[in-house]
């Protein structure tokens, strides 16, 4: 039995193109794998731990083996719980809209919490090494415009490029993608057609996940 962590990074609910496609993927996967478990983490609804002064100081002090204050202990323990919750999954699905050419701030906050030395990556004289390995991830991207590879517009895409880089940094090598674009620039008819195509693609991909 495998566990999927489904991370929703859009606050738009059913109106979200990225969530609609990811939902279709998860539904098709669950129908094909009824014994597996799907856990949903909506980063806009979740009570994510604050990564403020106490947590930041605790990160450095703990790395040096120095004692922590009670507040620092509590803040760092909350971070480690979030990391362990993330790492207990066997597979991952992410619904991700583009905001200002990048990713929503709540997902960035989530990554800032879980990407920690000794927990999700390590480093030595040879460089950095991801610690979250051997697990596939499916990302459903939605963008208002179109950013095709090999065009000048590709340089504006800090959504897909960032996510693939940060996931690769912590060890992911099997990163699969479904992209819905454009959801705004082409008008509503184009958006609906592109979403329908992406939903069908996601359903097919779910059978091999």
Curated annotation (Swiss-Prot):
<dbReference type="GO" id="GO:0016652">
    <property type="term" value="F:oxidoreductase activity, acting on NAD(P)H as acceptor"/>
</dbReference>
<dbReference type="InterPro" id="IPR029039">
    <property type="entry name" value="Flavoprotein-like_sf"/>
</dbReference>
<keyword id="KW-0288">FMN</keyword>
<keyword id="KW-0285">Flavoprotein</keyword>
<dbReference type="InterPro" id="IPR050104">
    <property type="entry name" value="FMN-dep_NADH:Q_OxRdtase_AzoR1"/>
</dbReference>
<comment type="function">
    <text>Quinone reductase that provides resistance to thiol-specific stress caused by electrophilic quinones.</text>
</comment>
<protein>
    <recommendedName>
        <fullName>FMN-dependent NADH:quinone oxidoreductase</fullName>
        <ecNumber>1.6.5.-</ecNumber>
        <ecNumber>1.7.1.17</ecNumber>
    </recommendedName>
</protein>
<comment type="similarity">
    <text>Belongs to the azoreductase type 1 family.</text>
</comment>
<dbReference type="GO" id="GO:0009055">
    <property type="term" value="F:electron transfer activity"/>
</dbReference>
<dbReference type="InterPro" id="IPR003680">
    <property type="entry name" value="Flavodoxin_fold"/>
</dbReference>
<feature type="binding site">
    <location>
        <begin position="16"/>
        <end position="18"/>
    </location>
    <ligand>
        <name>FMN</name>
    </ligand>
</feature>
<keyword id="KW-0520">NAD</keyword>
<feature type="binding site">
    <location>
        <begin position="98"/>
        <end position="101"/>
    </location>
    <ligand>
        <name>FMN</name>
    </ligand>
</feature>
<dbReference type="GO" id="GO:0016655">
    <property type="term" value="F:oxidoreductase activity, acting on NAD(P)H, quinone or similar compound as acceptor"/>
</dbReference>
<comment type="subunit">
    <text>Homodimer.</text>
</comment>
<feature type="binding site">
    <location>
        <position position="10"/>
    </location>
    <ligand>
        <name>FMN</name>
    </ligand>
</feature>
<dbReference type="Pfam" id="PF02525">
    <property type="entry name" value="Flavodoxin_2"/>
</dbReference>
<keyword id="KW-0560">Oxidoreductase</keyword>
<comment type="function">
    <text>Also exhibits azoreductase activity. Catalyzes the reductive cleavage of the azo bond in aromatic azo compounds to the corresponding amines.</text>
</comment>
<dbReference type="GO" id="GO:0010181">
    <property type="term" value="F:FMN binding"/>
</dbReference>
<dbReference type="InterPro" id="IPR023048">
    <property type="entry name" value="NADH:quinone_OxRdtase_FMN_depd"/>
</dbReference>
